């Protein structure tokens, strides 16, 4: 789905469920990580998370669009557009929009663990980040560190 298709879909959903046109722009924002979408108050544009479309499909995306359009239409008409406002919650129920989107299934990255050992006192260090062994030394005896293993 590209920018033109998503723009057309949002305009259709707006007319179908709200009876009002969507007059601004919608786009996918690849930087969104934990949210399905967001409504921008200053520009009145809507940004959507493409990964929700990839993961859950068009139906979930339409739910997110309806949620963001609730913010949009309430803000445009000067009514309560925030999550805590009664107008917002009533409009969500009316158009059957989700209050929250599904949780993203994180493909957990393998956490790397680096092990270092002091060459003098044999103290072992376990770290999640790499250490520059030319710059850092053992905190106990000031001896040189050598990498032992890197586990993923």
From Swiss-Prot:
InterPro entries: SprT-like_domain, SprT_Zn_ribbon, Uncharacterised_SprT-like. Residues 7-147 form the SprT-like domain. It comes from the Bacteria. One of its GO terms (cellular component) is cytoplasm. Binds 1 zinc ion. Its main location: cytoplasm. The keyword Zinc applies. The active site is at 68. Its cofactor is Zn(2+). Zn(2+) binds at residues 67, 71. GO terms for biological process: response to stress. GO terms for molecular function: zinc ion binding. Pfam families: SprT-like, Zn_ribbon_SprT. Keywords: Cytoplasm, Metal-binding, Zinc. It is found in: Cytoplasm. Belongs to the SprT family. This is Protein SprT-like.
